[in-house]
Swiss-Prot record:
Domain of life the protein comes from: Bacteria
PANTHER family linked to this entry: 50S RIBOSOMAL PROTEIN L33, CHLOROPLASTIC (PTHR43168), LARGE RIBOSOMAL SUBUNIT PROTEIN BL33C (PTHR43168:SF2)
Name of the molecule in the record: Large ribosomal subunit protein bL33
Gene Ontology biological process terms, A to Z: translation
Amino acid sequence: MAKKTDTRIVINMACTDCGERNYTTEKNKRNDPRRIELNKYCPRCREAKVHRETK
């Protein structure tokens, strides 16, 4: 069986324009040591904007 390790952490994604935290996802700390930036849909802005990982 696979062993559960602490390589994956849960992060929040916040819109860079309005600052609302819209998405929750997991990331692997080894593969992505820096903050993730993804283009996602923001319901408050009503369009696709860049979402950045928050602490």
